[in-house]
C-alpha cells in the first residue's frame, strides 16, 4: 500500500511532557507514486518541525519548495536567500552544490533542531560522488554534509531504488538507521506496450488529442517534435 500521511510518525518516540525524547533515522525504499514526499510534508506540518531538504537537481528543489509551501510546510528556496544570513527558524530546500551556504552566520549552530530530508537519495549520492560541477568543492560539500547529518535531529532518506553505495555513505558517517522496503508497486497491473519503431510511435501520437512524450535525450525529443510537425505541440528541453 501507499505510505500514508502518518507513516513517518513511527520513527519518533511518543511525547513526554510535551517533548519528543527520541527520533530515529530512516531510509525508505518505495516505488514512485507511493506518497514519499506527501508523507514527509505531513510529518513536518503536523509537528511544525524545522527541516533542511537536500536535492541533486534544481528542478526537484523548485518542485519541493512549491509543494511544501502549498501544503503548509513553509520553507525557503536557497536561490531566494542569496546575500543574507540564514536564521535559526528558516526551513530550507537547497541543491547540494550550495550546501556550504548552511555554514553562513549562526545557522550551523542549530543543526540539531532540524530534520534533514534526502529525497531521491540514490541519485543524490551518485551526484555527490560523480558530478563534475562539484570537482572544485567536493571536499567542502562532503565536510558540510557530514557535519549536518551527524548533528541533525533526524535523517529521512527516500527513493524508489536504494543502492549499497548510498547506504555505505551513512555507514562511513557512523549513522544508525532503520531500512524500510515498501513492496507496493504503484503501476502494477497497468498494461504497457513496447514499440521498437519511432515512426510507429509518431503515427500513434498524431492520432491522440493530448499526449505526453518523454525522451532520454534532447536530440531524440527534437527529432520526434520535428516529425510530428504540429504547431500546437510544445517542445520542452533543457534549453
Predicted features by range, described:
Residues 161-207:
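Interdomain hinge/linker at the junction between the two RecA-like core domains of SF2 helicases
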Amino acid at each position: 500500500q501507499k505510505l500514508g500521511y502518518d507513516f513517518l510518525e513511527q520513527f519518533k518516540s511518543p511525547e513526554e511532557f510535551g517533548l519528543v525524547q527520541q527520533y530515529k533515522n530512516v531510509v525508505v525504499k518505495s516505488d514512485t507514486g507511493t506518497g514519499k514526499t506527501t508523507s514527509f510534508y505531513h510529518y513536518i506540518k503536523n509537528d511544525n518541525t524545522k527541516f533542511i531538504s537536500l536535492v541533486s537537481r534544481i528542478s526537484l528543489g523548485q518542485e519541493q519548495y512549491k509543494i511544501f509551501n502549498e501544503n503548509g510546510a513553509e520553507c525557503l528556496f536557497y536561490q531566494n536567500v542569496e546575500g543574507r544570513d540564514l536564521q535559526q527558524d528558516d526551513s530550507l530546500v537547497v541543491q547540494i552544490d550550495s550546501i556550504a551556504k548552511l555554514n553562513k552566520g549562526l545557522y550551523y549552530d542549530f543543526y540539531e533542531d532540524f530534520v534533514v530530508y534526502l529525497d531521491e537519495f540514490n541519485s543524490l549520492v551518485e551526484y555527490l560522488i560523480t558530478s563534475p560541477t562539484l570537482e572544485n568543492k567536493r571536499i567542502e560539500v562532503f565536510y558540510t554534509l557530514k557535519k549536518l547529518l551527524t548533528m541533525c535531529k533526524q535523517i529521512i532518506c527516500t527513493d524508489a531504488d536504494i543502492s549499497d553505495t548510498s547506504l555505505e555513505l551513512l555507514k562511513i558517517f557512523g549513522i544508525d538507521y532503520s531500512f524500510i522496503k515498501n513492496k507496493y508497486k504503484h503501476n502494477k497491473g497497468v498494461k504497457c506496450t513496447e514499440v521498437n519503431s519511432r515512426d510507429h510511435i509518431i503515427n500513434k501520437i498524431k492520432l491522440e488529442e493530448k499526449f505526453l512524450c518523454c525522451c532520454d535525450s534532447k536530440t531524440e525529443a527534437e527529432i520526434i517534435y520535428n516529425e510530428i510537425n504540429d504547431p500546437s505541440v510544445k517542445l520542452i528541453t533543457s534549453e
